């Protein structure tokens, strides 16, 4: 209890003393964010200095890069040129199984179709598939 009374008495006197020294917060000029305009101006100036410093550094780096390019006869990459990638593939678009089957069934374009051997080829395919299925049951790799 005595500590509380002492704090109350000394606290009031301390705030009066600090108010007399100019440490009192009078709520002067503040912006919407609650910051002093001088602080904001200083931050903006500091940001501009930082950006200018980085611009200078990048210009120096570009001069160094250009010197290396000149020394070793390296061409600068064009920034505007973009390579056209189709879903990450370098080649053309991949054909679907339906498109491949349609190409296989185009008898007029193939040599077998022109010679009239389509029926014999189909019979050979059927026999080979049947033989493979029969043999596959005997070996462990087919299971």
Swiss-Prot record:
Feature: compositional bias, Basic and acidic residues: 23-33, 44-72
Region described as Disordered: spans on this chain: 16-72
Main localization category: cytoplasm
InterPro entries the record matches: Synaphin (IPR008849)
GO biological processes: modulation of chemical synaptic transmission; regulation of synaptic vesicle fusion to presynaptic active zone membrane; synaptic vesicle exocytosis
The keyword Transport is annotated on this UniProt entry: yes
Membrane-crossing residue ranges in chain numbering: none
Coiled coil regions, renumbered to chain: 40-71
Keyword terms of this UniProt record: Coiled coil, Cytoplasm, Exocytosis, Neurotransmitter transport, Transport
Compartment(s) where it occurs, according to its Swiss-Prot or TrEMBL record: Cytoplasm, Cytosol
GO cellular component: axon; cytosol; SNARE complex; synapse; terminal bouton
Gene Ontology MF terms: SNARE binding; syntaxin binding
Keyword rRNA processing included in the entry's annotation: no
Function as written in the Swiss-Prot or TrEMBL entry: Positively regulates a late step in synaptic vesicle exocytosis.
Family per record: Belongs to the complexin/synaphin family.
Name this protein carries in UniProt: Putative complexin-1
UniProt source species: Caenorhabditis elegans
Phylogenetic classification of the source organism: Eukaryota, Metazoa, Ecdysozoa, Nematoda, Chromadorea
Gene: cpx-1
């Amino acid at each position: 209890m005595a500590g509380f009374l002492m704090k109350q008495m000394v606290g009031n006197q301390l705030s009066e003393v600090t108010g007399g020294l100019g440490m009192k917060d009078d709520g002067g000029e503040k912006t919407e964010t609650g910051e002093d305009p001088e602080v904001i101006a200083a931050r903006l100036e500091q940001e501009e200095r930082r950006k200018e410093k980085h611009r200078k550094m990048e210009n120096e780096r570009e001069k160094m890069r250009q010197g290396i390019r000149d020394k070793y006869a390296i061409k600068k990459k064009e920034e505007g040129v973009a390579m056209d990638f189709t879903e990450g593939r370098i080649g053309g678009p991949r054909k679907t199984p339906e498109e491949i089957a349609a190409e296989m069934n185009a008898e007029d374009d193939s040599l077998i179709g022109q010679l009239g051997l389509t029926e014999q080829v189909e019979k050979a395919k059927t026999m080979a598939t049947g033989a493979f299925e029969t043999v596959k049951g005997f070996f462990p790799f087919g299971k």
